[in-house]
Amino acid sequence: MEKVPMTANGYAALQVELKQRQTVDRPRIIEHIAEARSHGDLSENAEYHAAKEEQSHNEGRIADLEDKLARADVIDITKLSGDTIMFGATVTLVDEDTEKKAVWQIVGEPEADAKKGRISITSPLARALIGKKKGASVEVMAPGGAKAYEITKVEWREPS
């Protein structure tokens, strides 16, 4: 079983979602199925089929969460330091063409969320950053072509 690196906050968030799906969503869906079943003929009962589909989706997500939690290698990034970029680092980059600044934290795949500034350790950008230090330049292949960035800051903090 391959371990998946994850921050403590990412692990806790997955635990919260799992508990919600098991203790709140699952009983609610079972109730919907029972109610729809009471309406008679199941072959033409759209409400019943929708509830069964929701149940299937929920159970699949529960299995996925349980797998991710079982394989998690929780890394306490508050105990990490230094100026070399690795898992958990929060990195400030400046686009060398546009001078636009961006801040990214390198996290495990299950907790990656670009809208929240968190990129997966397996992403092309993270792979280009790993092992680099403040002041270095990196080139990343993006959908629109190669992009060059300067690393202006490396920090260590839990994702928010």
Curated annotation (Swiss-Prot):
GO molecular function, one term: RNA polymerase binding
Record SUPFAM superfamilies: FKBP-like, GreA transcript cleavage protein, N-terminal domain
First and last residue of the signal peptide: none
Pfam family, one: GreA_GreB
Coiled coil regions in record: 49-73
Family matches, as InterPro entries: GreA/GreB_C_sf, TF_GreA/GreB_CS, Tscrpt_elong_fac_GreA, Tscrpt_elong_fac_GreA/B, Tscrpt_elong_fac_GreA/B_C, Tscrpt_elong_fac_GreA/B_fam, Tscrpt_elong_fac_GreA/B_N, Tscrpt_elong_fac_GreA/B_N_sf
Domain of life: Bacteria
Assigned keywords, A-Z: Coiled coil, DNA-binding, Transcription, Transcription regulation
One GO BP annotation of this record: regulation of DNA-templated transcription elongation
HAMAP family linked to this entry: GreA_GreB
Function: Necessary for efficient RNA polymerase transcription elongation past template-encoded arresting sites. The arresting sites in DNA have the property of trapping a certain fraction of elongating RNA polymerases that pass through, resulting in locked ternary complexes. Cleavage of the nascent transcript by cleavage factors such as GreA or GreB allows the resumption of elongation from the new 3'terminus. GreA releases sequences of 2 to 3 nucleotides.
Similarity annotation: Belongs to the GreA/GreB family.
Protein name, per record: Transcription elongation factor GreA
Organism: Rhodopseudomonas palustris (strain BisA53)
Name of encoding gene: greA
